[in-house]
């Protein structure tokens, strides 16, 4: 039996069915005004297409989508998608590029992810809260720039550009938050 949820109860990470599609909540906001129904705005990712949109779900009820997750490791790019290997059965699957539009920026060989399925249909991957990645290129530190929180640009192999502290060099491993792509700290 399907579980029905009030839209105002949706939180980041929840998955639900809406207008024939399966969505995962990235972030949400609920604004309650006097004598009116609250306005629920959710930034959501369509798990079938990878598209990220904002849905206004004021007063709506949605059906919860139960997503099965299995741990897999990224192996290689086969030219049409990314190949992942199941950590227990060693089964390999290829996930098309369009299903990993955001996640592809942070996946390196050996990255462990959770592959998501709904009723056997492949929905994409879920990354851990923090990932260790390798800086392939970093700008030179500016001599004398000792202002608090001085940063410079750095790039991953995927060409993802983000800000890192001045002391980070090319080839170093750092920790990033894949939900926003920002630097968290040095990897140990």
From Swiss-Prot:
A Pfam family this chain is assigned to: EFP_N
Location(s), subcellular: Cytoplasm
Pathway: Protein biosynthesis; polypeptide chain elongation
Major localisation: cytoplasm
Keywords assigned: Cytoplasm, Elongation factor, Protein biosynthesis
Alphabetical GO biological process terms: peptide biosynthetic process
GO molecular function annotation: translation elongation factor activity
Regions crossing the membrane: none
UniProt entry tagged with the keyword Cytoplasm: yes
SMART domains in alphabetical order: EFP, Elong-fact-P_C
GO cellular component, one term: cytoplasm
InterPro entries: Elong-fact-P_C (IPR015365), NA-bd_OB-fold (IPR012340), Rib_uL2_dom2 (IPR014722), Transl_elong_fac_P/YeiP (IPR020599), Transl_elong_KOW-like (IPR013185), Transl_elong_P/YeiP_cen (IPR001059), Transl_elongation_fac_P (IPR011768), Translation_prot_SH3-like_sf (IPR008991)
Superkingdom assignment: Bacteria
Record HAMAP family: EF_P (MF_00141)
Family (UniProt): Belongs to the elongation factor P family.
Functional note: Involved in peptide bond synthesis. Stimulates efficient translation and peptide-bond synthesis on native or reconstituted 70S ribosomes in vitro. Probably functions indirectly by altering the affinity of the ribosome for aminoacyl-tRNA, thus increasing their reactivity as acceptors for peptidyl transferase.
Listed name of the protein: Elongation factor P
Organism: Ureaplasma urealyticum serovar 10 (strain ATCC 33699 / Western)
Originating gene: efp
